[in-house]
Amino acid sequence: NYIGRASRDMKYRFNWNAPIIWSQHEPNTFYHAAQHLFKTNDQGKSWKIVSPDLTRDEDEKQGNGGGPYTNEAVGAENYGTISYVVESPHEANTIYVGSDDGLVHITQDGGESWIDITPKGLPETIINAIDVSPHDKATVYIATTRYKFNDKTPGLYKSTNYGKTWKNISGNIPNGAYTRVVREDNKRKGLLVAGTELGVYISFNDGKKWELFNLNMPVLAITDLMIKHDDLIIATQGRSFWILDDMGLVRQFDGNSNTKLYDPENSTIGNWSSELNSNNSDGTSSFTGVNPANGVVTVSYTHLTLPTNDQ
């Protein structure tokens, strides 16, 4: 029973969002994390510890209900936990781990040994997301968050050598738009998308310059995002999902040309039927939606000089 217990008295300290991932390289293998990293090769029937404590493990920050930073009496909130785990898509046995108290570690031998690769001078912070570049096995990005310390400064970092050195790429993201996630596009190298407290930011030059990319979204706190099937999929703190359908035009944008002819995505002609299609005799018409227009939809933007008079 964890209700009202101090974190220091628990064998394992799990984060509220304790990470669990499946291995891209080993069948039936998953990783889960508390202050240690656990591994199963049999779909969870048995687990083994494959890391030491990868947090700061500071006793004074492991009080009742996870205090002082994560006070929550039922024992589901703790501090000094692993907050993010990611396996390299390029190399088996290469795993990055981040903690909610600001440490980053890497193993390149499946957990036999670990190296502290925390950026020098990084203050105590939540390592909220880690993203291995889909284009280069040695490049990795992290998103840090310090709102629990009343610090709303964005914190995005990039390494090109497995975390040996880091560069802050937060650039011109404004104070207040503190960061929770950053991803690199899987087709255009250097195209980054970041989720912040104030919405989505995009960079076409690997973080040198950022632009607000909310489009038709209201101001939203972004908790996670990913690029899948050429779509940008966004999760918000308000428990909603937003999808930007087709990243193709974004990938082609060069930011310089006044005139640009974009290549449209390939169109798919569908021909199918569904049991939900009916004449409402069985009450299923409520499931009927409106399909997109047939053919290719063409959108053009034209720069116009407006007249200065009322005509």
Question: Each predicted region: which residue ranges?
Answer:
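Beta-propeller blade termini and top-face loops
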Residues: 1-286, 293-294
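Short edge beta-strand/loop segments characteristic of extracellular beta-sandwich folds
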Residues: 297-301
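Conserved small/polar residues in nucleotide/adenosyl-binding loops
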Residues: 302-308
